[in-house]
Amino acid sequence: MSQFIKYYKKYLLKYFFKIPPWLLRILLPLKRKSIRGFKIDYQSYAYINLNPKSTLHSVKDEDLLKIRKIIESNKIKSRLSLKPKIPVNTKDHFIHSKSSGAKMLLREYIPNISNPHKIILFFHGGGWSIDSVETYHDMIKYFSDYLKIRIFSLEYSLAPENKFPHALLEAEDAFNWLINNRNNPKHISICGDSAGAHMVASLSYKLLKQNSEMPNSLLMIYPPCDPFFQKESIELFKDKYFLLNKDLYWFWDRLKNNKENENDPLFNHLKFDLEKKFPPTILVTAGFDPICDEGNAYAEILKKQGTEIKVLNYPTLFHNFAFMTKLNAAKSAVHNFLDEYKKIV
């Protein structure tokens, strides 16, 4: 019987995005728990349940390089992001990092019609330890076409080989490279999802504290902010909704260089202490995400700081939904926050 269920799930997963939502409820009946007055989107929950739970938290550092390649291959094959309506061209730039001495890939996405002045610098997610420009390739093509803006996606160095603040310094190098290549910082927006959103916050704080030139706007998509895991959502959504707590602890541990990092505002965003405000900001949270509460807490800090911030919460969605626009609810949410982003970018 268990073998039949295994093959049945494999079959459903193969044809998942061709199955109408009404039929999916018949083929895969699931009970959803109401939490905080909401139930997770059915199609999203079905997709999560058909996929095996992550075991990333059990991976040893010496095996991580091999695991990264497997994850990248699987994500590229799965094609979870919708394709742009009009093909988006790309151009690879290899830039020098002054901080690390490394040569970094900065991939430029060029939509068919774009504003010649505005650009976005993007940092991908993956817990600072996995994923790449390639795994996010389809998502950024879709974003670029929808926004009609050129996007530069950075291949930053991953942890644990490169601990905090290595990737942050590379992110700063990429921002400065864009400015040095005749781009007015007033026309540059910075965006990231998950670990990449954490980098957006860190870089913005660093630039502000240095009195450096600032980007014109920020988009942070479900940022991790609290390495102490103090918020209620950590426990509420710990093991059923894509991002597992065990993986979350593992990610932070890979990034951390020493215990002092935990109280560094560049690492722990709930320790932000600047009185200056950020540029106009959009912060996205998902209701069924273990880190949604810390994202909301961080947004409150920015509000008190005087930042013009809009928090967009999608109460029936989960961590990483922006990567999965083939899911109907995820697509609607992405369109919604990108429409809001257009107003400030």
Regions found by a protein language model. Name each.
Residues 4-18, 23, 89-345:
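Alpha/beta-hydrolase superfamily serine-hydrolase fold, recognizing
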Residues 1-109:
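A glycine/proline-hinged amphipathic helix-loop "lid/cap" segment
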